[in-house]
């Protein structure tokens, strides 16, 4: 069997979509195992840019694309995305949805907006797309699953009960107008007609493929440092975008996972609130942002930029049991002069070579850097590792040494062809 997992090692936006698109050329199945439409994945094919939110990044390839049990699905977003890529010539008949996946409802989106607007609450920086409230209902056992949509009577009963409870909150606590049951029910009946043929039990399908030694690529959204358990809590997402999240989010045994592929940007970025030890503020940080085009694929929000944090990198490598590292956007570092990588933190006079749990401690952390010589050459057309500038290779080799994990691919540009394959994944 061949189960490959691709995870982000930082705070997202590492370029997972591009790498998954490349790897999915030989994959029989590509499986999303967590998250929802709260993150954008950019895939560039022959200079043409595709921005995906909910669909697996491998949708542009021939392999079956699975939206797994651990994903939360907004049917409207799903159908809009299907329609958008079909209009550009892509086929989507190979996309299926787990009958165990939970459904994002209008009251989830409304609740998300309310929670982020309350003055006394910590501002997490949510995308306000209902992801967190949908996962909250899932854990509270109030959620509506895709399987419920296949039984209209059951869906009606669950929606009516949920909406009664949510409207109590909207009207009596927040003084808002109640949501209309009939409007929502009719809207979702329309969605059901368009997606019901895609709703299946994906667990036996994925496991059968693994048992038949087919290549199954598991795709995480967000990244390690946004994990609900291991990220910079509470500035995290509501699911587990780690290798361990595959077992619960896709329904496969950890024994069926052969490779853990960590995607790491050559510097570090973060969107929204939360601690960021290596953040570069001011003109130089803005320069990296401009060169790297560091703006959200979906929201357009500017990303905070900083030096490569290998305390975070080691943490991600260890927890995910990574077998391969993919370095992206190293071309952005060309011409920046001296480069820095963070190898430890100093907090209240104590040196940490790991990520502490306490967010307030991270806010006080001082990065301990190693400084390396940079390079000025344009590397975007280089195809062989040995053709990279000497200082670029030294940078990569030092990263590999600190992580104690081999770098297998180096991305030198946004197009799927702009990759240097050091060793086969």
Swiss-Prot record:
SMART domains listed in its UniProt record: Adenylsucc_synt
GO cellular component: cytoplasm
Binding site for IMP: 13-16, 38-41, 127, 141, 222, 237, 301
Alphabetic keyword roster: Cytoplasm, GTP-binding, Ligase, Magnesium, Metal-binding, Nucleotide-binding, Purine biosynthesis
Pfam families tied to this protein: Adenylsucc_synt
Residues where GTP binds: 12-18, 40-42, 303, 329-331, 411-413
Enzyme class: ligase
Subcellular location: Cytoplasm
Record's catalysed reaction(s): IMP + L-aspartate + GTP = N(6)-(1,2-dicarboxyethyl)-AMP + GDP + phosphate + 2 H(+)
Coiled coil: none
Co-factor: note: Binds 1 Mg(2+) ion per subunit.
Location of the active site: 13, 41
GO BP: any one term: IMP metabolic process
Residues annotated for Mg(2+) binding in this entry: 13, 40
Oligomer status and interactors: Homodimer.
Function field: Plays an important role in the de novo pathway of purine nucleotide biosynthesis. Catalyzes the first committed step in the biosynthesis of AMP from IMP.
Family membership noted in the UniProt record: Belongs to the adenylosuccinate synthetase family.
UniProt cross-references to HAMAP family, sorted A to Z: Adenylosucc_synth
Name under which the protein is recorded: Adenylosuccinate synthetase
Biological source species: Fusobacterium nucleatum
Gene: purA
